Amino acid sequence: VSVAGLTAGLCGSARAGHFDGVATVVAKLFGIVGPSTAYFGKKDAQQLAVVRRLASDLCLPVEIVGCPLVREPDGLAMSSRNRNLSSAERAAATVIHRGLRIGAEVVMAGERDAGTLRRVVANVLTTEPLVRLEYAEVVAADTLAPVEVLEGEVLVAVAARVGDVRLIDNMTVNVDVRGAGVDLGVTVAPTGEGLCAAR
């Protein structure tokens, strides 16, 4: 099963055929189980978009729910891959969230040029020697098509290698006539009790 138009860019550019595999497995799963609702994390925004398009294109009677991206207290997006980072790499990896956060500040200050936002995020990540940036992209949240101007719902997506570990992260930017809102996910409280909105 192939979902055209959503899989060529972002992670798909470095992982040929990956999302065709995802779409095929998910289509089989939905066919066997017949769920009314399915939950996918927003951290892998491209996968979520692919699954939503799959369900729509095949007219599957399933609601696809995006679950909030969850962060560690220091901002690093939660992932099973984090355990493979050394202590130095783990500390360095927080630059990914820092880049997104600084990008969010730029948007909230009024920046609407996607190229400028992309450069701001990328420049922050390249300050960390242990981090090798794969991409920092600004795309339409639904189609994943590159955008030039920030308007409507936009996804700022990042992929980077820290040591041998590949990490992804993103934030959603909503821009309308009233201004801009930014969704960086939710952050686990330092005590581990509950979740609090990210800022």
Residue locations for each model-derived region?
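Divalent-metal (Mg2+/Mn2+/Ca2+)-assisted nucleotide/phosphate chemistry catalytic cores
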Residues: 1-39
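Glycine-rich, Lys/Arg-enriched anion-binding loops that position phosphate/diphosphate groups
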Residues: 37, 44-134, 139, 197-199
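Short, surface-exposed amphipathic charged segments that create phosphate/polyanion-binding patches used
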Residues: 1-2, 76-85, 147-153
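Phosphate/ribose-recognition catalytic cores of enzymes acting on nucleotide-derived substrates
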Residues: 119-199
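Gly/Ser/Thr-rich beta-alpha loop segments that engage phosphate groups in nucleotides
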Residues: 14, 19, 43, 77, ...
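Hydrophobic side chains within alpha-helical segments
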Residues: 23, 47-50, 172
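Generic secondary-structure boundary/loop-capping signal
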Residues: 3, 7, 16, 57, ...
